[in-house]
Amino acid sequence: GLGDVYKRQGMGLDKRIGSRFLRAGPAYGGSCFPKDTKAIISTADKFKTNLSVVKSVIKSNENRSKILLDRIYQMLNKKVKNKKITFLGVTFKANTDDMRDSSSLKMIPWLSKKGAIIKYFDPTGYKNEFSKLKNVTNKTSIKDAVQNSDLVILHTEWNDFKSINFKN
């Protein structure tokens, strides 16, 4: 069969869909989509209509952080404590400072509680959300964020991250 990239490109050719929202990411978030999908379900329930596809989308999105945390856990050989983990981007999507329902709000606290040493860089300079967490540091540059990391997570697809040279 076709690979995911080709499927995405094909679907994106349809102007009603477009390609902008067909890229893989940690989960959807923000102020609109989570609220809107829940409102659709609420309205459907009032009219006794089962929208199983929308319910599945919500459930799948809620599970994304757990799935990604499990992958991180496996990549680090089930040893998260004292591992240096960098998040590049913490907002729910690029080109915004919106943190609402960002999967980083679930992932970073969980990793911090497990003893990981978290560094993050976001082009917005965002730093308030994690300031009270142990072992979580906001960095002011990509280089400072990724230096000496055991694992780098590209969380948000900012253009700033497209040309990173990890060799330097």
Segments and roles (model prediction):
Residues G1-N168:
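Structural/interface elements that position substrates and couple domains in central-metabolism enzymes
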